[in-house]
Amino acid sequence: MSKIIIATANKGKAKEFEKIFAKFNIEVATLADFPEIGEIEETGTTFAENAALKAETVASVLNQTVIADDSGLIVDALDGAPGVYSARYAGIAHDDAKNNEKLLKNLEGVEPDKRTARFHCTLAVATPSEKTSFYTGEVEGVIAEQLCGTNGFGYDPLFFLPEFGLTMAEIPAEKKNEISHRANAIKQLEKDLAEVVEKVTKK
């Protein structure tokens, strides 16, 4: 089985990548498998900058092809916030409860038809001495007025999908892995996936 490295320490993201890549018979390794690398500070101002920073840093250290993603929630009524700061929106990295609480507070009084939003994902594929490639995916939704569902992570309990009548945290994981922003970005990557896997297996 081929193995590919995903430059993330986020367990929720890692689990999604594992399930999505499993259908291609590709095993996933993450930064949890390489503790010596440590945390990579996301200093970019765009999803692409942060994804490239993570992928290129890890590719350089391990001397092989690496995929990284940077993703987040874009809320129209908040001028695109939380955006690249989604994970640390409330000031503490990866505190889902605090982030959701702040999002609801900032949207108090906003009418349902004005609560449109989208999850965005940019994938960066970095290979030492080669130009980094980018793939993007999005999924459209509306921010609910209260938390619903226990599946998923992050803003999933607030991200309402009108076509399903459910939040992202209420739909089965299998369905989420078909329609999510991350899944849509990987669909864009699919056309080049054989080439990426070939680079990995050469190492």
UniProtKB/Swiss-Prot annotation:
Give the UniProt keywords, A-Z: Hydrolase, Magnesium, Metal-binding, Nucleotide metabolism, Nucleotide-binding
Matching Gene3D superfamilies, A to Z? 3.90.950.10
What residues bind substrate, as annotated?
Answer: T8, A9, N10, K11, G12, K13, S71, F153, G154, Y155, D156, K176, H181, R182
Q: What is its EC number?
A: 3.6.1.66
Molecular function in Gene Ontology: dITP diphosphatase activity; ITP diphosphatase activity; metal ion binding; nucleotide binding; ribonucleoside triphosphate phosphatase activity; XTP diphosphatase activity
Asked if the keyword Amino-acid biosynthesis belongs to this entry, the reply reads no
Q: Which CDD domains match?
A: HAM1
A GO CC annotation given for this chain: cytosol
Listed under catalytic activity are: XTP + H2O = XMP + diphosphate + H(+); dITP + H2O = dIMP + diphosphate + H(+); ITP + H2O = IMP + diphosphate + H(+)
* Cofactors required: Mg(2+)
Active site (catalytic residues): D70
Which sites bind Mg(2+)? E41, D70
Q: Which GO terms describe its biological process?
A: nucleotide metabolic process; purine nucleoside triphosphate catabolic process
The similarity comment for this entry is: Belongs to the HAM1 NTPase family.
Function recorded in the entry: Pyrophosphatase that catalyzes the hydrolysis of nucleoside triphosphates to their monophosphate derivatives, with a high preference for the non-canonical purine nucleotides XTP (xanthosine triphosphate), dITP (deoxyinosine triphosphate) and ITP. Seems to function as a house-cleaning enzyme that removes non-canonical purine nucleotides from the nucleotide pool, thus preventing their incorporation into DNA/RNA and avoiding chromosomal lesions.
Q: Which NCBIfam families does this chain map to?
A: PRK14822.1, RdgB/HAM1 family non-canonical purine NTP pyrophosphatase
Its protein name is: dITP/XTP pyrophosphatase
Q: Which organism is it from?
A: Listeria monocytogenes serotype 4b (strain F2365)
